Structures are given as structure tokens and as C-alpha cells.
């Protein structure tokens, strides 16, 4: 039932590990927050009272905030103060409604974690067990010394072949390096430290 060609196993494992790296780059918390946001929208459209009220309050909060930012506190102080009080009140109501739905948010987060595990961790462990003796491909004769071929065949493959264990190790190494480079590129550059002022330098002397 679960028998696959070696080429299909190679592609399957690559896709699963690539998804795992993408999830790591995005972050589980970010994914949970986005799915929760979509869930609240869907629940409000479905008529869930708490989420309907939460969606309405959020829309009103955004509207009041735009109005508040559009006027000057100095020129229209009375109107700005009124909007500011209204904003604070709405913000408090939104927080209260969000807390009222916290139990449902926890359930959604749990389901997201289960979905991530089912998408990444479960297929990897299943493949390690089910396809542990499958030779994914064979090395050309005498490309490596015998002891290297023997190591690459560990722990279940005949010498000269490459199995899932070594293939996954190689893929993880490449994808981890790629993940590091992407994170490094996306991080904000560190500013060059400023040279100490002349007075500070003299003081130290």
C-alpha cells in the first residue's frame, strides 16, 4: 500500500523537509496568529456572537484611530480628546472580547501544532521506519574508497548504495545552511559602532 519508487521517496522527503524549513522561517507563532485571524473572520461571517462583536469593535477601533490621527491635538483639542477616550474604551472592549475567546484560540493553536506535526514530523518518522531498507540510488563503482561506501550504506543498506538515513542527513545539512543564509539576509544589519568623542578619549587617558 505504501510502496513507493526510490525516486518518489527522494522527492517526498525533500518536500517534507523543505516545508519544515519554511515553517521554521515563518515561525509557528506567526502561522498560528494568521490562522486564528482567518478563523475569527470566518466565525464572524458564520454568525458567532462573540466573533461578530469582536469584528465590529475592531472595525470601529480602526475607524476611530484613523479619525484621531487625521486631526491635530493642538488645533482641535476637544475633538481629539473625545476620540482618544473613545479609542481607549474600544481598545479595552476589544481586549476583553479577545480574552473571552482565548480558550478557542488555544484550541486553534493546538490544532495548528497537530497539523504541522502531521505534515512534517509524522511523515519523516514513518519514512525512516517503513523505507529504512530501500536503496534510493547506487554510487558508481570505485567513486569512493570502500570504507566511505560502507559508512554511506549505514545502517540498513548494502555497501555501494545510499539509503534514507544518509539522504536525509545530507538534505538536512543543505536546507539548514540555506535557512541560515535566508535568516541572515533578512535580519536587520548591525550598525557600525560610533567612534568615541575626543573628549571621552581624553577622559579615558
From Swiss-Prot:
Domain of life: Eukaryota
One Gene Ontology term of the molecular function aspect: protein-membrane adaptor activity
Cysteines engaged in disulfide bonds, as pairs: none
Cellular-component GO terms for this entry: endoplasmic reticulum membrane; GET complex; Golgi membrane
A matching Pfam family: CHD5
GO biological process: tail-anchored membrane protein insertion into ER membrane; vesicle-mediated transport
UniProt topology in membrane: Multi-pass membrane protein
Ranges in coiled-coil conformation: 53-103
InterPro entries reported for this sequence: Get1 (IPR028945), Get1_fungi (IPR027538), Helix_hairpin_bin_sf (IPR029012)
Biological role: Required for the post-translational delivery of tail-anchored (TA) proteins to the endoplasmic reticulum. Together with GET2, acts as a membrane receptor for soluble GET3, which recognizes and selectively binds the transmembrane domain of TA proteins in the cytosol. The GET complex cooperates with the HDEL receptor ERD2 to mediate the ATP-dependent retrieval of resident ER proteins that contain a C-terminal H-D-E-L retention signal from the Golgi to the ER.
Subcellular locations according to the entry: Endoplasmic reticulum membrane; Golgi apparatus membrane
Subunit details: Component of the Golgi to ER traffic (GET) complex, which is composed of GET1, GET2 and GET3. Within the complex, GET1 and GET2 form a heterotetramer which is stabilized by phosphatidylinositol binding and which binds to the GET3 homodimer.
Keyword terms: Coiled coil, Endoplasmic reticulum, ER-Golgi transport, Golgi apparatus, Membrane, Transmembrane, Transmembrane helix, Transport
Residue ranges crossing the lipid bilayer per the database entry: 10-29, 117-137, 162-178
Spans within the Cytoplasmic topological domain: 30-116, 179-205
Family stated for the protein in its record: Belongs to the WRB/GET1 family.
Keyword Membrane: yes
Sequence ranges on the Lumenal membrane side: 1-9, 138-161
Name of the protein described by the UniProt record: Golgi to ER traffic protein 1
Amino acid at each position: 500500500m505504501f510502496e513507493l519508487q526510490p525516486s518518489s521517496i527522494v522527492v517526498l522527503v525533500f518536500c517534507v523537509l523543505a516545508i519544515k524549513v519554511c515553517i521554521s522561517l515563518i515561525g509557528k507563532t506567526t502561522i498560528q496568529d494568521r490562522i486564528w485571524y482567518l478563523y475569527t473572520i470566518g466565525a464572524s461571517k458564520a454568525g458567532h456572537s462573540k466573533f461578530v462583536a469582536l469584528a465590529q469593535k475592531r472595525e470601529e477601533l480602526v475607524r476611530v484611530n484613523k479619525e484621531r490621527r487625521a486631526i491635530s491635538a493642538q488645533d482641535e483639542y476637544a475633538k481629539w480628546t473625545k476620540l482618544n477616550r473613545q479609542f481607549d474604551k474600544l481598545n479595552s472592549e476589544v481586549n476583553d472580547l479577545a480574552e473571552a475567546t482565548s480558550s478557542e484560540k488555544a484550541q486553534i493553536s493546538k490544532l495548528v501544532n497537530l497539523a504541522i506535526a502531521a505534515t512534517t514530523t509524522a511523515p519523516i518518522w514513518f519514512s525512516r521506519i517503513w523505507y529504512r531498507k530501500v536503496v534510493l540510488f547506487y554510487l558508481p563503482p570505485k567513486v569512493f574508497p570502500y570504507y566511505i561506501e560502507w559508512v554511506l550504506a549505514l545502517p540498513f543498506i548494502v555497501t555501494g548504495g545510499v539509503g534514507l538515513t544518509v539522504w536525509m542527513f545530507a538534505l538536512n545539512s543543505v536546507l539548514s545552511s540555506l535557512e541560515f543564509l535566508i535568516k541572515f539576509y533578512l535580519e536587520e544589519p548591525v550598525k557600525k559602532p560610533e567612534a568615541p568623542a575626543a573628549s571621552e578619549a581624553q577622559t579615558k587617558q
